[in-house]
């Protein structure tokens, strides 16, 4: 999934991104980013959790914030999208999550976030569809946490959209050997393992449990929490 987005460049244009669909509700009560074939790009707070949503506008995809920490995504013949709920800023917290994830084609379920200085987009892949993102990235090593083996990879995106506009930046990947949809993810263990393999992080921006899809169909219904 070489072109499987690297973005959420809408971070600098949140107010305009949400203006039309949210005219009828307060920003902190944005339960329905819906009623269109493609949910408009947005980020903000909902029921005490940070959410972020981005798509390239292709196909049909609907993101909905539900009660508490729960969200839902349904997509059909989509382009590229990524979105989910979590926290801002990201930390080494232990994340509990669960729910349902059923991609028909390319898709990821991951703890997903960004840092600045250095600018890094990171993924802890818990499950994926037909494409393993490690297949086109540089293998760095393996470590064990949260009941399974994770393989570590790094890749570089050149002149691609990011939280700071069009930039060149690295992507860090931890990919779980045995896919799952539910469990605990100790993010500090991943951060430590990346550091040990020469993959430093910077100042954290958001950190969400995200659903991502690319030229596929499917649905997910995910909740998140911490210990």
Swiss-Prot record:
PROSITE patterns on file: GH11_1, GH11_2, GH11_3
Pathways involved: Glycan degradation; xylan degradation
Recorded catalytic activity of this chain's protein: Endohydrolysis of (1->4)-beta-D-xylosidic linkages in xylans
InterPro entries from the UniProt entry: ConA-like_dom_sf (IPR013320), GH11/12 (IPR013319), GH11_AS_1 (IPR018208), GH11_AS_2 (IPR033119), GH11_dom (IPR033123), Glyco_hydro_11 (IPR001137)
Catalytic residues as annotated in Swiss-Prot or TrEMBL: 121 (nucleophile), 212 (proton donor)
GO terms classed as biological process: xylan catabolic process
Disulphides: none
GO molecular function: endo-1,4-beta-xylanase activity
Signal peptide range: 1-19
Family recorded in the similarity comment: Belongs to the glycosyl hydrolase 11 (cellulase G) family.
Name this polypeptide is given: Endo-1,4-beta-xylanase 1
Species assigned in the record: Humicola insolens
Source organism phylogeny: Eukaryota, Fungi, Dikarya, Ascomycota, Pezizomycotina
């Amino acid at each position: 999934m070489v072109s499987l987005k690297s973005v959420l460049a809408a971070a600098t244009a949140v107010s305009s991104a949400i203006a039309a669909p949210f005219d009828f509700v307060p920003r902190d009560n944005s339960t329905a980013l819906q009623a269109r074939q493609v949910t408009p790009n947005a980020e903000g707070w909902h029921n005490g959790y940070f959410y972020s949503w981005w798509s390239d506008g292709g196909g049909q995809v609907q993101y909905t914030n539900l009660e508490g920490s729960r969200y839902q995504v349904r997509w059909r013949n989509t382009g590229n999208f990524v979105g989910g709920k979590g926290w801002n800023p990201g930390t080494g917290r232990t994340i509990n999550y669960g729910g349902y994830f059923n991609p028909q084609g390319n898709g990821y379920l991951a703890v997903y976030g960004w840092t600045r200085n250095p600018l890094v987009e990171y993924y802890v892949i818990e499950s994926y569809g037909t494409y393993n993102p490690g297949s086109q990235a540089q293998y760095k090593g393996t470590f064990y946490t949260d009941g399974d083996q994770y393989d570590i990879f790094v890749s570089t995106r050149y002149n691609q959209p990011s939280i700071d506009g069009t930039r060149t930046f690295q992507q860090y990947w931890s990919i779980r050997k045995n896919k799952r949809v539910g469990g605990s993810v100790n993010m500090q263990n991943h951060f430590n393992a990346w550091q040990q393999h020469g993959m430093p992080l910077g100042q954290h921006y958001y950190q969400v449990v995200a659903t991502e899809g690319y030229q596929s169909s499917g649905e997910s219904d995910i909740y998140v929490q911490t210990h």
